[in-house]
């Protein structure tokens, strides 16, 4: 009996040392060596300081910035500590009302957009922190952003086109635009930040 207890303790301690110590150190070291930016959360640096992440959406509200997808993460959205969707089903009246309110707000913000609204601009992502919008979601905002920044519409539209990323490995997913990267490029094009965030 004592032998079994000792063997169990030895195995437990060895596995704890291996799985709680050696394995995490090895994986972290390999990630830092092979993919240092991605291993640290894909930070986006501006003037030597972290401004955001390529992987986590931010809430932009100013008329001079492109806005991301709606977020259901946390009470006010975009709360990384409360990542998650609304969990509302397709028959939910609450979801239908939220989508209608978002659609009305989008039409009010972007009155020049006459095409149907892109679905990603009225629906929250599963994580609530999606950093991307569809190319159509960015295109619908071009006139508003250009007017707020005093830029030619063609220049802003070209900037959107330059920031469209294709599917991963050419097969997985849809074309998309990283909103943070697009807004930083917009700041560079316009020569500074706009009012709002």
From Swiss-Prot:
It comes from the Bacteria. It comes from Nitratidesulfovibrio vulgaris (strain DSM 19637 / Miyazaki F) (Desulfovibrio vulgaris). This is Potassium-transporting ATPase KdpC subunit. The system is composed of three essential subunits: KdpA, KdpB and KdpC. Keywords: ATP-binding, Cell inner membrane, Cell membrane, Ion transport, Membrane, Nucleotide-binding, Potassium, Potassium transport, Transmembrane, Transmembrane helix, Transport. The keyword Nucleotide-binding applies. GO terms for cellular component: plasma membrane. The keyword Cell inner membrane applies. Belongs to the KdpC family. Disulfide bonds: none annotated. Pfam families: KdpC. One of its GO terms (molecular function) is ATP binding. PANTHER family: POTASSIUM-TRANSPORTING ATPASE C CHAIN, POTASSIUM-TRANSPORTING ATPASE KDPC SUBUNIT. Its main location: membrane. It is a single-pass membrane protein. InterPro entries: KdpC. Part of the high-affinity ATP-driven potassium transport (or Kdp) system, which catalyzes the hydrolysis of ATP coupled with the electrogenic transport of potassium into the cytoplasm. This subunit acts as a catalytic chaperone that increases the ATP-binding affinity of the ATP-hydrolyzing subunit KdpB by the formation of a transient KdpB/KdpC/ATP ternary complex. It is found in: Cell inner membrane. The chain crosses the membrane at residues 9-29.
């Amino acid at each position: 009996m004592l032998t079994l207890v000792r063997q169990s303790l030895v195995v437990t301690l060895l596995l704890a040392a291996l799985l709680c110590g050696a394995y995490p150190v090895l994986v972290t070291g390999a990630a830092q060596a092979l993919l240092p930016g991605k291993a640290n959360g894909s930070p986006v640096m501006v003037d030597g300081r972290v401004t955001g992440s390529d992987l986590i959406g931010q809430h932009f509200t100013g008329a001079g910035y492109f806005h991301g997808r709606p977020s259901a993460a946390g009470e006010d959205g975009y709360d990384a500590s409360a990542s998650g969707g609304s969990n509302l089903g397709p028959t939910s009246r609450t979801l239908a009302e939220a989508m209608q309110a978002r659609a009305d707000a989008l039409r009010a913000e972007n009155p020049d957009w006459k095409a149907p609204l892109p679905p990603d601009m009225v629906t929250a992502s599963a994580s609530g922190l999606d950093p991307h919008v569809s190319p159509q979601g960015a295109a619908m905002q071009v006139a508003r952003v250009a007017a707020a920044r005093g830029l030619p519409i063609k220049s802003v539209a070209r900037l959107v086109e330059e920031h469209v990323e294709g599917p991963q490995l050419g097969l997985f997913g849809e074309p998309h635009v990283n909103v943070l990267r697009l807004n930083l490029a917009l700041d560079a094009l316009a020569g500074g930040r706009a009012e709002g965030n």
